[in-house]
Amino acid sequence: MGIAGFEITVLADQSKTDGYEIFQQSGPAGTGPSPHSHPWDESFYVISGTVLCGVGEEESLATPGTLIHVPGNTSHWYTFGEEGGEMVSMTSAGNASEMYEDLARSDTDRSKFGAIAGKHGQEYR
């Protein structure tokens, strides 16, 4: 599903895993979510390209093979690098897949993202 210029594919949702969820995410250069937080933990494993990531006050450039872990309720963001990128992400108990589906239905209107994500426990900063 497309969300604000990048793609998210649900590989496994909580109905299949008893809680955690797994996603494939990819996008062209410059795409990615703005700073946000949510109650669930999230980890990203970069497969290709580069991804500039911010977690709390730390910022790093993730290359293939890099794992980034984001504890729940921690502000974070990422932007796909110059050649775009691809990664696999996993969330702990939460409803990220439902939130992504709702965001995809918003026709990429970012002005609606805060209210939509808020219904799922996510807050944009």
Predicted regions, residues:
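A hydrophobic/aromatic-rich effector-binding and dimerization subdomain
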Residues: M90-R110
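Short acidic-glycine-tyrosine-enriched beta hairpin
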Residues: K16, Y45, T50, E57-S75
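Ligand-binding loop in jelly-roll beta-barrel domains
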Residues: K16, L52, G72-S97
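Conserved short histidine dyad/triad with adjacent acidic residue
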Residues: I8-V10, I22-S37
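Short glycine/proline-enriched turns and hinge-like loops at secondary-structure junctions
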Residues: G19, S37-P39, F80-E82
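A short, N-terminal "cap"/entry segment at the start of jelly-roll beta-barrel domains
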Residues: M1-G19, R105-R125
